[in-house]
């Protein structure tokens, strides 16, 4: 496989993928936090909550970057 065949068709593909996966992870992490709370495992609650915040930050940043890039393409 050549390097060229691995390149995405859309220049924003990887950014969109990060937005999708970060958002998807948020939903999973909410479940993990709930499970840990039900089990009384505060260490896991804290860990999953920190990971959740990282994913929320990544998703928000990806959204902002994508909006900016798409607006610049329109100009």
Where do the model's predicted regions map?
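Iron-associated oxidoreductase/ferritin-like identity signal
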Residues: 1-75
């Amino acid at each position: 496989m050549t390097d060229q065949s691995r390149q995405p068709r859309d220049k924003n593909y990887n950014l969109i993928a990060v937005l999708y996966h970060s958002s998807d992870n948020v939903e999973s992490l909410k479940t993990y936090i709930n499970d840990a709370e039900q089990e009384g495992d505060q260490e896991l609650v804290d860990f999953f909550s920190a990971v959740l915040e990282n994913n929320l930050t990544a998703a928000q940043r990806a959204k902002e970057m994508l909006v900016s890039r798409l607006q610049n393409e329109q100009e």
